[in-house]
């Protein structure tokens, strides 16, 4: 399954606010979009778990294959699989750039990374899924075009609050990863346990 590139409003109307996908916010209705959406019926356990999984996939801009790989990796690590899964996704370079305010959304952040505008420890890294770790320094490439894009993005950051595991110096356009993100700083409202259950069926 490929990465979603369609209208974001339809997705957030169905799944609720997805801060990584878009800044747009719509009131979530009691029924899904579409002409048959108002028909009420009891949702199955599968449907509930699927919705939580879809929240994660669309918010972080992952393909189904990428998400499956993250779940498998989380299961192999010690600790709560659900929380480790969220940490793996939050520590991706495209998400770190987004959380630092260098891009308004994760898709915009991914584009910055893909186009070689972002450096990690003074080396250009063009892989959005690159796993950042404590001690990593995130900077903008020493190029006027790169700096201009990020300076403009900083005027309208996607999320107002900088997570406790990150620090950012606007004057230098430099961020630092100080720690692994804690669960309370994950901006997406999601039940990660249901996602683990979905892939354990």
Curated annotation (Swiss-Prot):
InterPro entries: Ribosomal_uS4, Ribosomal_uS4_bac-type, Ribosomal_uS4_CS, Ribosomal_uS4_N, S4_RNA-bd, S4_RNA-bd_sf. One of its GO terms (molecular function) is rRNA binding. One of its GO terms (cellular component) is cyanelle. It is found in: Plastid, Cyanelle. Residues 91-153 form the S4 RNA-binding domain. GO terms for biological process: ribosomal small subunit biogenesis; translation. PROSITE patterns: RIBOSOMAL_S4, S4. The keyword Ribosomal protein applies. It holds the Pfam family S4. Keywords: Cyanelle, Plastid, Ribonucleoprotein, Ribosomal protein, RNA-binding, rRNA-binding. Disulfide bonds: none annotated. Coiled coil: none annotated. One of the primary rRNA binding proteins, it binds directly to 16S rRNA where it nucleates assembly of the body of the 30S subunit. HAMAP family: Ribosomal_uS4_B. Belongs to the universal ribosomal protein uS4 family. Part of the 30S ribosomal subunit. Contacts protein S5. The interaction surface between S4 and S5 is involved in control of translational fidelity. This is Small ribosomal subunit protein uS4c. It comes from Cyanophora paradoxa. The gene is rps4.
